[in-house]
Amino acid sequence: MNEDGSVCNKILIAFQDNDQIANLKESVLGEVFRLDKANTNHDENIIKGLTWSTKYYEVRYDLYVDTFDDFEEWCKDLISSEYDDLREVLSGIIVIDSYTMEKDKIDQNKLLGQLGSVLQDKFFVFMNTNKDISQDVIDELNDDNSMQLTSDSGNSVEIINYHNVSNLKLNQYNEKIGFERVREIIDTCEWSGGHRVQTVEAKADSTDVDLESVFNRLKEARLKYLEIEDEDEREQFALEISNEFAEFLQ
């Protein structure tokens, strides 16, 4: 708990246990959570008392660091009733592993869908370490996941590339990718423990746009746009959305 008795926010991050795990931990914990090497080069499973800060708020949170040998078994454990209490207190989950496109391998999409179905109102990121999967393929996977793997709770996994082979900053939809996209997701998540503290900067500028609302509306618009098959209807919808955001940002 926090000093005032409120429940502390918690994020679970899990790494595939292989010969690259030390480098992956240092990179992800450093780039996403801004932790220095002193906090990334040890075997502690819980890093307590961290602060996540944006222009608009800051929260205190604990970071749970886990590893797994078998992703399928790890998913089954986390989905089980034995872990109900843990899932309840989490704000979100980040999995670092290699995504496979091979049909004879485990059905990762099925596992991701099952895990997403029990993560109501939590963010869920799968960070792919497979260099052979391009950003365009990742975008296609996320489009499929948004429509096929969304659970009754409206929760779906977002797959994000760990490696930026092409040195891109944005994907084909002009969205952030890589570590910056992970940070953006956390910025706009529903923190499980609540207890957001508005920053001084946000208080001083009350006319700033509500970024969370903007991101959510953009996501909804993108999904609807992808479902429209007629090209003229697509262009009309894109124009309507453009005008909507122009008015919103005035």
UniProtKB/Swiss-Prot annotation:
<comment type="function">
    <text>Involved in gross chromosomal rearrangements (GCRs) and telomere healing.</text>
</comment>
<dbReference type="Pfam" id="PF10199">
    <property type="entry name" value="Adaptin_binding"/>
</dbReference>
<comment type="similarity">
    <text>Belongs to the IRC6 family.</text>
</comment>
<dbReference type="InterPro" id="IPR034627">
    <property type="entry name" value="Irc6"/>
</dbReference>
<keyword id="KW-0160">Chromosomal rearrangement</keyword>
<dbReference type="GO" id="GO:0016192">
    <property type="term" value="P:vesicle-mediated transport"/>
</dbReference>
<dbReference type="GO" id="GO:0030674">
    <property type="term" value="F:protein-macromolecule adaptor activity"/>
</dbReference>
<protein>
    <recommendedName>
        <fullName>Increased recombination centers protein 6</fullName>
    </recommendedName>
</protein>
